[in-house]
């Protein structure tokens, strides 16, 4: 869980920007989207294989 402390004389927008950056770095949002629905192991393997193939192509 990402957590930030709002600094003295820091605007809410700046604090929100820092929070969003920390969430992105931690991968929290991406992980939540990935776990939103159950994915069968066979589908997971297929997606992983296609991603590797795509990376290799580039």
UniProtKB/Swiss-Prot annotation:
Basic residues composition-biased segments: 43-58
Biased composition (Basic and acidic residues): 31-42
Annotated keywords: Ribonucleoprotein, Ribosomal protein
Stretches the record annotates as Disordered: 24-58
Origin superkingdom: Bacteria
HAMAP family in UniProt: Ribosomal_bS21 (MF_00358)
Protein name: Small ribosomal subunit protein bS21
């Amino acid at each position: 869980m990402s957590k930030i402390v709002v600094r003295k004389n820091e605007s809410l927008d700046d604090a929100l920007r820092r929070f969003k950056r920390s969430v992105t770095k931690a991968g929290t949002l991406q992980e939540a989207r990935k776990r939103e629905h159950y994915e069968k192991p066979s589908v997971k393997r297929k997606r992983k294989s296609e991603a590797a193939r795509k990376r290799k192509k580039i």
